[in-house]
Amino acid sequence: MIGGVLSSIYFQVNNEQKLKEVRDVPALALEATIPNSRVTGGGTNVEVFFRTHGNIRLVKTVGKGEFKLGTVQIDSFLSSVKVEQTWADTAYQQNLFFVHPKTKEMTNFQEDIKKVWETLQKIPDGTVAELAISFDKSYTLQELEPILYSVFEAQEMPPTPVWYALDTGLEAASDDRPRISSFEAFRFPEHIHFGNLETKQVKTKEEEVLEMMRVLSQHEEIVKQVTQRSSKELNLQKQYQYVKKHGIKVYGIVITGPSKELLKLQNSPHVRDATLGDIEFWNWFDRPSGSRH
């Protein structure tokens, strides 16, 4: 009883911002590092003796449907954070990869890329899919729009980018390891959620991405524990400063939509690599607000 009262006083009076950090920084970090992920709920409870216990529920978007990825349990004691991940599938399978434009040698992956397009060609019309594509160079978000428009043209509901591979200058591009796991570098989702974190006012998508990077770089210890990466792997401050100087540019995206529409990307001169994620039955229609899988 006394421990619970002390915890409430600690978080609510002296450290309300600390509670927000324990609750909302992990959610922001997960959406930035797990491909095509979105936090849909969960909560954080203050427990005895300065501890908190929280759960974050993650989903992914394939077509217009949301499908459970898993749950991340986060327990904190003062500034220490413990993380436990439980995936909907026994082990979360990483099928989405990117290739940085600096990587020149792609010979070993030509057969894999060919199989991606063949799969999209062979699967039935009534399906939607998730696809990671890499571009021939890094593009601003404004430059990306006409590239996608040239592929899909005017449609009421064209395939939708849901996650972006951000060029931070630190991507591990080499000829002996050309593909970069989508867990390895900084990304950002289509919709960035700051929760109740104190943030600067932003007006553009680019400003929003920079603000996300600023917030995460200021909480590197929490991000490190939540994403289970080392400071050397994250290097958040260095990535933030690079993007702040060079601007928001992306060299790949995760995009979802009707399988046959995604197949059109095969003919784009700007697409140099493709990896296929999940395939689901047709759901390419707008759902009533609040509807979820």
Where are these regions (language model features)?
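Hydrophobic membrane-insertion alpha-helices, especially the h-region
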Residues: 1-8
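Generic low-polarity alpha-helical segments
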Residues: 2, 153-157, 238-241
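Ser/Thr/Pro/Gly-rich low-complexity linker/stalk segments immediately outside membranes or between
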Residues: 13-27
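Context-gated lysine
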Residues: 18-20, 60, 64, 68, ...
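Short extracytoplasmic
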Residues: 26-58
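Hydrophobic transmembrane signal anchors and adjacent membrane-proximal interface regions, especially
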Residues: 56, 164, 168, 185, ...
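Extracytoplasmic beta-rich ectodomain segments of secreted or membrane-anchored proteins
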Residues: 63-196
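Extracytoplasmic/luminal low-complexity segments enriched in Pro/Gly and acidic/polar residues
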Residues: 200-293
